[in-house]
Amino acid sequence: MAQATSGAARFSAVPDAPRSDDAALVAALRADLAAAGFTVDRVTDLVGPEAMSAWSRDQAVPARRALRERGSQDPALSALTAFFLLGDPVRSSALDAALHTVGASGLVRLGLVEESTEGTSTGTATGAGTDPLLSAAMDLRPYATDSSEELWVASDLGAFQRPGVLRHDHVLGIGGASTTLVQSTPRRPVATALDLGTGCGIQTFHLLAHAEHVTATDISERALATTRFNLVLNAPALGLDPERLEDRVRLELGSMLEPVAGQHFDMVVSNPPFVITPRTPQESDTERFTYRDGGLPGDRIVRELLSALPSVLAPGGTAHLLANWEIPHDPQDAPEATWSRGPASWIPEGTGAWLIQRELQDPCEYAETWLQDASQQRDPEGFDRAYAAYLDDFASRDVAAIGFGMVWLQRPEDTERTAESRHGALTTDDAAGSPSAPRGASRDADDAAGAPNAAHGASQPGMSAPSGPEGERTASGTVEPGRAASSSLPRIFETVPHPIQQPIAPALAAEWERTVRLGREAADAQSGAAGQPAWLERRFTVAPDVTEERHGTPGAEDPSLILLRQGAGLRRTVILSSEAAGFAGVCDGELSAQQILTALGVLLGWEEGPSEQLVAEIAGLIAHGFLLEVSD
């Protein structure tokens, strides 16, 4: 698709997308939105928190009711809310009054409105003639986090704002999946970052807060045009010069890793088009929902991406993404026990990996989720055909379940690259990509490129015995043993279905750092470079969010079960041995771990010191953050 305006900046004038070729007009829109008070907090005050919560679930009735009752208190804000957030047609005069400088005509030039086909207005104005009804061509919503300035983010309208099946080149907005990725991405300072499958640009906005330069890619010109518009609209808040965006942001058109082949990044973030979709011989690109469907059969898009991502990571670089994976039927084990076999085999040797499965769906649940996501139920006959095709597709590969979760990859800092020699960059012809705790105006349907709420149906943390840095299979997952070299990175696969702290990124980063350190110390001790793990000489205290729970038979002298529960982070619950419980009970930061174990040995009559099992159990408590190191 060619740019609409000759000489315009790349992606600034793409048909059927918001335009950013007139920076002054976009700046005027920004000023008008701010003057109208079109912010998360002001909109919530106007319609009420319950209506905003319903709106996040794609339910507009409560907000419309609130606008009818209270909209006259703030006509400008009411008009913008009805127009951009609810998708209701509004009179041109009402938009002129709400946006004093830009007005309705400016919105038309920016590609944000179209003439309405409805005959009556549910908004704030009446009348006809020279005051036509206009409808939003794009969703434009306020967005903020606890640590950022207010932003406004454009994307395509959702199904509840514009009834009917979504367009196949739909530009995804802010939803549950994109928010999950925002909250699970660590915000360490980096020189270069890659937003793979940028969609509306939400991940790029957050990356700009801690990355010197961001490359954002997508297979969709409309998505890149929308991202560019959002960057120009929010340039001051993002620290950008709208006339020199390329100084900090580069937009690249192409499939998956093709646009960045041969380049290396300190951080990669992606909500890739991982949704499994039945393939048909006669399908064309125009029939595919490119924002969520990479065009490959089964979970191959995830398989190839996990294999190829290390090839674009700089030494020490990390990748953070959401993904799903098929779990084949196993007559001996349930999917909960076998899900990691596939992902573990896809990741190149030497690459550190942490996969957290958050949800498991059977084929029927999965089909229903994604058919409804694109509003395909609005075509009953087509829905039934597509549903049957999903079940046939899964049956052809003997799929028992589909897992969804978070992925963390890291390239070692001090080893030669192995991924590039074993895996080329991902270059599928048909692959596509659209992907701090955010507040307010974001749909919580896990939207189009995301997945169902990973915490759905879970209320209590699962229980497991803690695993040490060298790893063992537990009820919560698998930690593969580290290689002999002290530079090896861990490979962790675990299931965490219960609600977790948000944003979770700080806790994940801290746990990963502890696990890497403990693994290297264990490898040094095993190789003879050190007599014993170095952590034994350090002092620890119980984390402030940790509580102990004891269960016992009435009248019994000793408990039959001792639990430690976390109130923060991944909110793990672990079963402790009596020895480990005794160790944790003495950790007040005064004595080293070795001193405590020596005292326990005297008390319990050990002849040869603590068992390897106890040492691994304590190391697991340290890695998972139940015990925190005390600094000198």
Language model features with spans:
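Acidic, low-complexity/disordered tracts enriched in E/D and polar residues
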Residues: 3-79, 132-136, 141, 161, ...
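Long, charge-rich, low-complexity alpha-helical segments
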Residues: 75-123, 127-136, 180-186, 194, ...
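SAM-dependent Rossmann-like transferase core, predominantly class I methyltransferases
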Residues: 114-118, 129-193, 198-210
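Intrinsically disordered, low-complexity terminal tails and inter-domain linkers enriched
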Residues: 117-130, 236-246, 415-484
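S-adenosylmethionine
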Residues: 166-177, 187-188, 219-388, 401
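Conserved SAM-binding motif I beta-strand of class I
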Residues: 213-218
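Short hydrophobic/aromatic beta-strand or adjacent loop that forms the aromatic wall/cage
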Residues: 401-407, 624
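Core SAM-dependent methyltransferase catalytic element
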Residues: 405-415
